[in-house]
Amino acid sequence: MDDCVHKTVGSAARTERTALAVRAVLEGRRRGASMLLPFAGPAVVVSVAYMDPGNLATNIQAGARYGYALLWVVLLANVVAMLFQSLSAKLGIVTGRNLAELCRERFSRPVALAMWVVSEIAAMATDLAAFLGGAIGLSLLFRMPLLGGMVVTAIVTYGLLLLEDAGFRPLELAIGALVGIIGLSYLAELFITPIAWSSVLAHTVSPRFPDANALLIAVGIVGATVMPHALFLHSGLTQRRTPARTERERAVLLKFSNIEVVVALAIAGLINMAMVIMAAGAFHHGHPEVAEIETAYHTLAPLLGIGAAGVFLLSLIASGISSSVVGTMAGQIIMQGFVEFRIPLWLRRAVTMAPSFAVVALGVNVTQALVLSQVVLSLALPLPMAALLWFTCSREVMGAYKNRVFIAVIATLAACAVLAFNAVLILQTFGVDIPGLPG
């Protein structure tokens, strides 16, 4: 009991030290490279949304089927992600409100309630992909039933979520550690996998599609670029982390927030590119049909050894657990923001896990369930994306910090492109033929 109390006090102290360090930077009492560290956290947490098992499956398919040819798509998608996450962070810092709260305050009640329902369903779909991904990794690594992997994943994610009771810093550090595991795992894979680095560089900067089918894979990559829950979450993480007391402090917070977004999502982008590179090096010549996580694991072991396959599963487990935690955090922000209601953590976790257990208990094909979850996310994306653009372009909401014309135009064009790609993904999933695209 005393140990638990000591750990809780220690965790709370970390949060307090971080808040004091941020305040010291804002007041000009802390300088040098170390002044960046207290601001690291929100974007690191959000970056997990771009490294979830859904991204992993898409990247494996891209690398196995087309080698390095679609690396430029991953790079471009990551730049778009940086733009929208910076807007979400700015919204929270400038207004002191998160995206869900502003939707409730600015839109009619029926519209806000409809957005809440859709966003909650999207949060559950996010958790479905993340939770099942972590469970699959555990079941393959430890040779346990999938249901057993799900139980372990549930316990670990709930334990991590309890860290939030001690303040924001302990959970930020825990998720940062999981991101580090994912990154180091793929760094190790790059040393194990035979890679043609000259081709990697060439395809990263050469935008072209090898054939018409490659466009569909690109649609999957871009379609997962901006996740609905990430837009809600980032504004929620920044809104009260360190409130600005003056306009100067607000400007400093925005500067460091933008730096963190660029660094955190650049790391996420490099990890996504590493996923494609690993799949290309391991599967493209000889096994281009690999498209599922389980198949990738079973194919990787005889090709590169059990060590490479084990590292692959370790990254999958870290990805699934961290993504599941982040999805639950986003769901809580969505509920509090839209309907001003908070449920106990254990109940929130149970509700978000229920679809995953139902999928396994009913014998539903896991891959089909993951595909359906991505369709749900695509359907849920337009409303929060449009709301974010509307609010950040509004002088009434943002004051002097509203988007500049150049940023507004670029963000609008990027949003239209992402939504178009999502529409194609949805239509293709339901077997609708699109002129000019393969069926």
Swiss-Prot record:
It is found in: Cell inner membrane. The keyword Membrane applies. Keywords: Cell inner membrane, Cell membrane, Ion transport, Membrane, Symport, Transmembrane, Transmembrane helix, Transport. One of its GO terms (molecular function) is cadmium ion transmembrane transporter activity. The keyword Aminoacyl-tRNA synthetase does not apply. One of its GO terms (biological process) is iron ion transmembrane transport. It is a multi-pass membrane protein. GO terms for cellular component: plasma membrane. Belongs to the NRAMP family. H(+)-stimulated, divalent metal cation uptake system. This is Divalent metal cation transporter MntH. The gene is mntH.
